[in-house]
Design a protein with these regions (language model features):
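Feature captures the FAD/FMN-dependent oxidoreductase FAD-binding
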Residues: 51, 110-111, 115-119, 167-216, ...
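Ferredoxin-like iron-sulfur electron-transfer modules
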Residues: 1, 9-30, 51-72, 102-119, ...
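Iron-sulfur cluster-binding cysteine motifs and their immediate structural context
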Residues: 1-16, 26-46, 67-96, 140, ...
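FAD-site-proximal beta/loop scaffold in flavoenzymes
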Residues: 220-243, 307, 327-398, 402, ...
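A conserved FAD-binding loop/helix module that cradles the flavin
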Residues: 394-425
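GIY-YIG nuclease catalytic motif and its immediate N-terminal context
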Residues: 505-555, 568-581
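Beta1-alpha1 glycine-rich phosphate/pyrophosphate-binding loop at the start
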Residues: 34-44, 53-54, 60, 82, ...
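Glycine-rich dinucleotide-binding loop and its adjacent helix/turn
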Residues: 95-109, 171-187, 211-265, 369-385
């Protein structure tokens, strides 16, 4: 990092603190959970995975999960990508979670006596519960399924997210929290019962774990599955018997997960059909790459017209050409060329066209207001029912895991504030840490930078990956993590933009001329002294002594005789006036 030592070269324009962070630390600014990415990368480069994991835990209680399934918006923003490829931030997070010693989780505040109910044990709900518990509140989670995790457990296959990793993260964050499983809102209890039963606040994190339905001919035929439901049953150990030919309809992550799962269940041919063109598919790039490697055929810009069947069993699907996905206003409104059709043989169809909340729960008695699609309406995270907050997919729709964690953290802050706390702020106004050990400065890290002659040549380190044919035989994780040497090498590719962020602007000499206006005159005393006036070019036009500086300058302001002024108190103002006049004459 090099800066001008004289301060003659400065930023073209002044930055606010937030603007400076976004401009100079793009990775951290892009992370919804506000992870201190440069800090934990530096710790890994210094061979300290324990510290790296501790830093991650400060903002995200799911290090193992995020190391495997985060969509890493930080990498999209990484400045190293402008040189060659972004730093593999997600892979390094995985290394820290697999090799670092989990830090001791410490309560931030003593018990408050307040009770909070969290409905839904997905990533948003679990995160909110974790932080609310650390703030000293008594937290109870209500979960309709047998186990916690939400879409992490029931929507992401094991080959992408190892269940031991998921279980380890959840078990750590649940310490001190009561979990009630197989307890469904609207069926086993009502919202009003919680509000009237001693809970001081309720957080709705009920998710969007239901498949959107498609009303086309044959959708009710035997052999037709719905994407999220298909993955949920698979995660529960209920493996459906599929035929040799499977067609998946959809272009998102659920569709690709269904396609790869179908291969692992024995399907010989899997075709994925989506409305979007190849560059527009919403699924993560890695998912698309893995699908192509495993032999999934992708048909872009096609949509389903009808499902064909014989004796109520699927035989194929008729497709129509999609000419556009969004209208001129950017709204989802597909258009088709009905004259261009194609038929694909199939023994099974998996419809994965989107997700939505459980409409029966959302629009049940005594629930907060929601839009037509079933997503709760909120201001911040607060709903239109006092004490009730909502967040995660139940508000924004299906989103990433890191976004759900961010929503849960925000909800915890707002609920804590509602209950009389101060959120994550300590007495100094700085966010407190939920882990024992290094504080926000992470001062144990090496400050040494030095010169690395091969720095620019260092290529991104890829994760180990099973052979495509081998990985289709089981639901074992596709990728393996870094070795210690690989992790240090990859972490050392970081440009360390945080160093530039920590260099504050050079203090310039104070401006001697003040703008002649009412605000500036508020700082002028009604005392004896000398003042000078200047024009718009800051050339002196008047030097005068006075018994009352404030009164004299107020008069000059009324006359609009100058644009700038300066003053100095001096009881011997006539003498000082003469001195200044002499200096002026000598200069000009």
């Amino acid at each position: 990092v090099e800066v001008c030592p004289t301060g003659a070269l400065t930023d073209l324009k002044p930055f606010s603190l937030q603007e400076r962070e976004e401009a100079l630390l793009p990775c951290r600014a892009a992370c919804p959970a506000e992870l201190d990415i440069p800090a934990y990368l530096r710790a890994i480069a210094d061979a300290d995975p324990d510290l790296a994991l501790s830093i991650i835990y400060e903002k995200a209680p799911f290090p193992g999960v995020l190391g495997m399934v985060c969509n890493h918006p930080c990498e999209e923003a990484c400045r190293r990508g402008e040189l060659d490829q972004p730093v593999a931030v997600c892979n390094l997070k995985r290394f820290a979670s697999e090799n670092g010693a989990p830090p001791e989780i410490q309560p931030q505040f003593p018990p408050t006596g307040k009770k909070v109910a969290v409905i839904g044990a997905g990533p948003a709900g679990l995160t909110a519960a974790f932080y609310l518990n650390s703030y000293g509140h008594d937290v109870t989670i209500f979960e309709s399924e047998e186990k916690p995790g939400g879409m992490l457990r029931y929507g992401i296959p094991e080959y992408r997210l190892s269940r031991p990793v998921l279980d380890a993260d959840i078990s750590r964050l649940l310490r001190g929290i009561e979990l009630r499983t197989r307890t469904a809102l609207g069926k086993d209890f009502q919202l009003a019962e919680l509000l009237n039963g001693g809970f001081d606040s309720v957080f709705l994190s009920t998710g969007a774990a239901h498949s959107k339905k498609l009303t086309i001919q044959g959708a009710d035929s035997a052999g037709v599955y719905w994407g999220v439901d298909f993955l949920r049953e698979l995660s529960k150990g209920n493996r459906p018997s599929l035929g040799n030919r499977v067609v998946v309809i959809g272009g998102g992550n659920v569709a690709f997960d269904a396609a790869l799962s179908a291969l692992r269940l024995g399907a010989k041919e899997v075709t994925l059909v989506c409305l979007e063109a190849e560059a527009e598919m919403p699924a993560f790039e890695k998912e698309i790459t893995h699908a192509r490697e495993e032999g999934v055929k992708i048909m872009n810009s096609w949509g389903p017209k009808a499902i064909e069947s014989q004796q109520a069993a699927v035989t194929g699907v008729i497709l129509k050409k999609c000419t556009g996905v969004f209208d001129e206003e950017g709204k989802f409104r597909p258009s088709y060329d009905e004259s261009t059709l194609e038929r694909v043989d199939a023994d099974n169809i998996i419809l994965a066209i989107g997700q939505e909340p459980d409409q029966g729960v959302v629009f049940g008695a005594g629930m907060p207001s929601a839009g037509k699609s079933g997503f709760f309406k909120v201001k911040g995270t607060g709903t239109d029912i006092e004490k009730v907050f909502a967040g995660g997919d139940a508000v924004r729709g299906p989103a990433s895991v890191i976004r759900a964690i961010s929503d849960g953290m925000r909800a915890a802050r707002e609920i804590d504030g509602f209950l009389g706390g101060k959120g994550r702020l300590d007495a100094s106004g700085r966010e407190t840490s939920v882990v024992a050990g290094p504080g926000p400065e992470h001062g144990t890290m090496s400050p040494k930078i030095g010169r690395d002659e091969k720095f620019s040549e260092r290529a991104r380190t890829a994760l180990g990956c099973l052979d495509p044919e081998e990985r289709k035989k089981s639901f074992s994780p596709i990728e393996s993590g870094y070795s210690a040497e690989q992790a240090r090498t990859e972490a050392s590719r970081c440009l360390q933009c945080q160093l530039r962020f920590q260099i504050q602007g050079v203090a310039l000499p104070p401006e001697k001329w003040l703008v002649l206006d009412k605000k500036a005159l508020e700082g002028v005393p009604p005392k004896e002294g000398v003042y000078q006036l200047a024009d718009e070019k800051k050339i002196t036009t008047r030097i005068a002594g006075t018994q009352n500086l404030l009164q004299a300058l107020a008069g000059e302001l009324e006359k609009e005789s100058a644009g700038y002024f300066q003053f100095e108190e001096d009881p011997m103002y006539t003498k000082r006036e003469s001195e200044l006049l002499q200096k002026y004459l000598q200069k000009y």
